[in-house]
Every structure is written in C-alpha cells, then in structure tokens.
Amino acid sequence: MPKLSFASLLLLCAASAWAAIPRAPAGAPGPYDAKAWRADWPDCAWEDGVSEGRLSVVSRPTGQRWRVDYAPGRIGPSEGGTAWNQSFDGRDEVILSYVVRFSPDFDWRRGGKLPGLGGGPGKTTGGRRADGINGFSVRPMWRADGNMEAYAYHAGQTKDYGDSLSLPKTFRLPRDQDVNIRLRVRLNHPDRADGLLELKVTYGQTTAEVTAQTMVWRKAPTLRADKLLFETFHGGNDLSWAPERACHAEFGDLRLE
C-alpha cells in the first residue's frame, strides 16, 4: 500500500474534522426525537428543544431536512426553538453554509437567531460578553419584516450584548422559498484588527451581503473557530420578541469548509 504524502494526511485530517457534522438528518420523515438526534450528533453534550418535541424530519426533492417548530408566546431555545453546539477541530478560517426555508405563515416578530459559528472555551451569547480570550460567536439573525443581520459577540464590542451588522435595509427574506445562507469567519492576528466577517444570503435571483474586515475576534493565538452553533429561536430577551402564532423553518444541506 503506497504511503500518503504529508499534504494528503493533512487533507484526510481536515475531512475527518468535518465528518461529525451531518449535512442532513439520517432518519425517515417524521418525529426527530432525542434518540435520532443522538445518532446524528453523537458528540454533542446537550440540546434544547429536541426532547420537548420541537424537531422533526421533512423530505424535499433535494433531500431530508430538519424542521424546527417555534412555540407561540415563547422565546429562547429552551422554550421556543432549539439549540445544540457541535465542536470541531479549530481553524483560523471557516465557512458555514446551509439552506433555510421559512413557513408560509412565519412570524418574524422582532427577530430571532439562525445557526452560526463560535470558538473558545466560554459561552459568548445571551449577554455574556466576549473579551478576546473567552471566545466569540456570530449567528445570522432575522429581524422584523424579514430584514437580516449578522449578530456578533467579539472582543471589539462595547456593550454586553452582541453587535448587529445589517444587510441593506431594503432586503427582505421570503417565506415558503429556499434561502441559501453563507457565513464566513476569518480570525484576526491577535495583535491586529484584521478579522473578517462575511454573511451572504441568496434566494432566486436576489443576493445580499454584509462584510466587515476589521473584526477583533481574539487576543490570544490559541483561540480558534471550533464550534457549530445550531441555534434557532425567537429572541431577544423579553416576550415582545415572541411569535404570536405557531410557525416553523426547515434546515438542510449543512456544510462546513
């Protein structure tokens, strides 16, 4: 058997790092319970919303998808959506992409979170401020009337909650149509403000994006991008963000590169 080159071994290791990230649910259409979730995400230590029955599997011509049901009058993943975090081998640059489809009756309300990326030993969401050592996070976020932004916790933030980097105000997310999300993060040199954040959203012939090239994600070289944040829920920190009616969204074709 021929020996693999060093470059080939690096590629093999990189491929194995992503192997734990499923592109779509493996099971048949129907309920997606904790057992099915564990089979797809065996390395995740916790979840919100799965055991409560807010996830299911649906089939589309392009493949299986996760369906998340958002509870009316509720915010956050523990009561009104779902969340889990999947670790992967740390990198200085990562691209996350997936397809999301909002239900025909989707209630944007004031806004809510979509799956994103994070890194570091701490939890930098929910008002827990990033300091360049404890970690960072960035998640796409829908806003009222279907506008959209990247919502980032980073070392350059000046308040406890994250900063909003908005797409053009004229942009509107559609309901009942596939939307392609592409989120790119490149970490800064620890002594420079040269990090990258790029969010690109496409549906049909419509594309919108926001880019920031002076992000300070970290202050230590050991901090790297190493988490997929599969989090989606309405909120916001009070019930004014809660949907007034039941609605859902589908997620599929999940990729890291």
Where are these regions (language model features)?
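Bacterial N-terminal signal peptides that target proteins for export
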Residues: 1-8
